[in-house]
Swiss-Prot record:
Residues that carry a glycan: N194, N199, N221
Keywords of the record: Cell membrane, Cell projection, Ciliopathy, Cilium, Cilium biogenesis/degradation, Disease variant, Glycoprotein, Joubert syndrome, Meckel syndrome, Membrane, Transmembrane, Transmembrane helix
Disease note: Joubert syndrome 20: A disorder presenting with cerebellar ataxia, oculomotor apraxia, hypotonia, neonatal breathing abnormalities and psychomotor delay. Neuroradiologically, it is characterized by cerebellar vermian hypoplasia/aplasia, thickened and reoriented superior cerebellar peduncles, and an abnormally large interpeduncular fossa, giving the appearance of a molar tooth on transaxial slices (molar tooth sign). Additional variable features include retinal dystrophy and renal disease.
Transmembrane segments: 23-43, 262-282
Subunit details: Part of the tectonic-like complex (also named B9 complex). Interacts with TMEM107.
Name of the protein in its database record: Transmembrane protein 231
């Protein structure tokens, strides 16, 4: 009958030597070479300490019903028309003030409690001699993130579009995107930018100047921008028809970069260290077995009797 190897187990051997012997020195050296180089390899291969990480979240966005509109007119009626939801701004406009009809609606498409888009429509009544060649529009939003970092801010969508031909309607369909110059910190409340984009209480014209508003906004490290590469300018307005701005602004899911917390960094570093360490442990185990079996360093070999056998002898 042919015999097969059905089971095997290693026999344990120990090697004895003094604590100050060459063998002890060799073991110390081997331990150092096993545990320290993986650390250096992990460290030198970059990304040992996780500095930035990212996650996805749909922000909670709310239109704040603040609007600032400047409509640039054709040369025959020189200048512009303006209107905003800020009484102080409107007072400054004199006879350039023209009150439009505004209707807005926020929609939650997937019924998850977060609004997904804003439908904004503005109809600016015009006299038959007035022609709109360009539009500057600011809408403000309250913008919140919850999942990793709690961010609360007031942000804006700035829309500017102009065309050489007088328009009847401007159609915009774009995303309100988050722009980060800096990763968010993990945990805690970030209300640094929970300040209004336009200071509506100020009586000074300077505070409503578009260059000033945009410049102050761009100083921020976290902003939102309206991203619509192709606003559509429709022409052919009837003499008594208003100029219409039709905007659909979507609130998409964002990839948010943040600074990981301490334990996340430690976990990431540990995983890298251990996966390299395993290779070193395996290699040095072979080296140690070779060195002791072949008596490269002098020791006294002892074969340890397996424990089970000892027990058995004791019992019988
Ligand atoms: C953010 O600002 C709004 C309006 O000023 C205020 O009602 C709200 O409490 C603020 N939120 C935080 C977290 O500071
Ligand atoms: C808004 O303007 C008023 C008047 O100039 C000023 O007192 C107030 O501090 C301003 N608020 C902010 C938030 O800048
Ligand atoms: C904005 O980011 C820069 C660079 O990361 C940083 O030095 C600065 O302190 C940040 N400003 C604020 C107000 O957090």
């Amino acid at each position: 009958m042919a015999l097969y190897e059905l089971f095997s187990h290693p026999v344990e051997r120990s090697y004895r030597a003094g604590l100050c012997s060459k063998a002890a020195l060799f073991l110390l050296l081997a331990a150092a070479l096993t545990y320290i180089p993986p650390l250096l390899v992990a460290f030198r291969s970059h990304g040992f300490w996780l500095k930035r990480s990212s996650y996805e979240e749909q922000p909670t966005v709310r239109f704040q019903h603040q609007v600032l509109l400047v409509a640039l007119l054709g040369p025959e009626s020189d200048g512009f028309l303006a209107w905003s939801t800020f009484p102080a701004f409107n007072r400054l406009q004199g006879d350039r003030l023209r009150v439009p009809l505004v209707s807005t609606r926020e929609e939650d498409r997937n019924q998850d409690g977060k609004t997904d888009m804003l439908h904004f429509k503005l109809e600016l009544p015009l006299q038959s001699t007035e022609h709109v060649l360009g539009v500057q529009l600011i809408l403000t939003f309250s913008y919140r993130l919850h999942r990793m970092a709690t961010l609360v801010m007031q942000s804006m969508a700035f829309l500017q579009s102009s065309f050489p031909v007088p328009g009847s309607q401007l159609y915009v369909n774009g995303d309100l995107r988050l722009q980060q110059k800096q990763p968010l910190s993990c945990g805690g409340l970030d209300a640094r930018y929970n300040i209004s984009v336009i200071n509506g209480t100020s009586p000074f014209a300077y505070d409503y100047d578009l260059t000033h508003i945009v410049a102050a906004y761009q100083e921020r490290n976290v902003t939102t921008v309206l991203n619509d590469p192709n606003p559509i300018w429709l022409v052919g307005r009837a003499a008594d028809a208003p100029f219409v701005i039709n905007a659909i602004i979507r609130y998409p899911v964002e990839v948010i970069s943040y600074q990981p917390g301490f334990w996340e960094m430690v976990k990431f570093a540990w995983v890298q260290y251990v996966s390299i360490l395993l290779i070193f442990l395996w290699v040095f185990e072979r080296i140690k077995i070779f060195v002791f079996q072949n008596q490269v360093v002098t020791t006294i070999p002892v074969t340890v009797t397996p424990r089970g056998d000892l027990c058995k002898e004791h019992l019988s």
